[in-house]
């Protein structure tokens, strides 16, 4: 509910983030649920965006997540010094981080209608 996301907003510090599952955009009922959820979050948080991951064990394999914050933009505020930390991961890198927020056109269209 909008009240729930309002409570999340109140609970977060200025540097806090909220992440939630936004379902699969592939199936009409899930896409509608994603739109309704994103609309509620956007009405509460000044920064609200969507990112994606491909998870083969999930229905359709294409899954969306919501990102919301009072002050932090997940791409613009990405600290590039991550690359200088010398952390070796099998999956994560800053290019992938930015790429997760690049959405296919059909998802952009769903979000434009919110």
Which role does the model predict for each range below?
Residues 5-6, 31-54, 66-68:
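Conserved Class I S-adenosyl-L-methionine
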Residues 39, 63-114:
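SAM/dcSAM-binding transferase cores
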Residues 13-16, 29-35:
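Generic detector of short, locally flexible boundary/turn motifs and exposed helical patches
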Residues 15-23:
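Conserved beta-strand signature within the Rossmann-like core of class I S-adenosyl-L-methionine
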């Amino acid at each position: 509910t909008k009240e729930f996301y309002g409570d999340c907003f109140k609970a977060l510090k200025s540097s806090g983030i909220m992440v939630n599952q936004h379902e699969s955009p592939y199936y009409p009922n899930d896409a509608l649920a994603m739109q309704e959820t994103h609309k509620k979050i956007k009405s509460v948080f000044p920064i609200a965006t969507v990112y994606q991951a491909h998870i083969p064990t999930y229905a359709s394999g294409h899954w969306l997540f919501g990102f919301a914050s009072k002050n932090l933009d997940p791409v613009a505020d990405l600290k590039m010094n991550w690359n200088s930390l010398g952390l070796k991961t099998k999956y994560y890198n800053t290019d992938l981080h930015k790429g997760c927020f690049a959405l296919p056109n059909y998802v952009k269209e769903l979000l434009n209608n919110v």
